[in-house]
Design a protein with these regions (language model features):
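Short capping segments at the starts of secondary-structure elements
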Residues: 35-40
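Pre-recognition alpha-helix immediately N-terminal to the DNA-recognition helix
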Residues: 26-31
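Basic amphipathic alpha-helical segments that dock to polyanions
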Residues: 60-70
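A short acidic, leucine-rich amphipathic alpha-helix
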Residues: 43-49
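Short, Lys/Arg-enriched N-terminal segment that forms or immediately precedes the first helix
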Residues: 5-18
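Short, leucine-enriched amphipathic alpha-helices that occur as contiguous helical runs
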Residues: 7, 24-25
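Non-DNA-binding regulatory cores of transcription-related proteins
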Residues: 70-151
């Protein structure tokens, strides 16, 4: 799906929910959908302010909350008190491993896990709307640091 199509889908959804489609909100959505890494709300704010210094923190946070509630972005608690987001519209499904020490997020996809989740849902007659798998632990770099080794 093209970025313009993604933005139109989000715009229509927000308008249907009674939100005004302002220049700031359009910029926030464009930046969030155009970011292909895991970002914090403050990182998104900085990216938006680079394009328009008038973008408000409150509008970024409100817009992210609406985007998350609608399923256009997914919020990930990093285990260190932080929260990172990624846009999911137009992306292949994948899962995450989150380092509870440094907050780094690793994406992965495992066909066997997918197969087992589908079988579990089928076994109990459950229709899956969306699913997420987050594995929390300690990454290799932080494990080495804990042992006093160089990363």
């Amino acid at each position: 799906m093209k970025p313009e199509q993604e933005q139109t889908i989000v715009e229509n959804h927000l308008r249907q929910r009674g939100f005004r489609w302002t220049n700031q909100r359009a910029l926030i959505v464009r930046m969030a959908l155009g970011t292909h890494d895991h970002f914090t709300a403050d990182e998104l704010l900085l990216r938006c302010r680079a394009a328009d210094p008038r973008v408000s923190r409150a509008t970024v946070y409100r817009t992210l909350a609406v985007l998350e509630e609608a399923g256009f972005v997914e919020g990930l608690d990093t285990g260190d008190g932080g929260r990172r987001f990624e846009h999911v519209i137009g992306h292949d499904r994948h899962d995450h491993m989150v380092c509870d020490v440094c907050g780094r997020i690793f994406e992965f996809r495992d066909d066997e896990i997918e197969r087992r989740q589908a079988l579990a849902a089928k076994r109990i007659g459950f229709r899956v709307a969306r699913q997420t798998l987050r594995i929390h632990g300690t990454c290799r770099r932080c494990q080495r640091a804990e042992r006093g080794e160089r990363p």
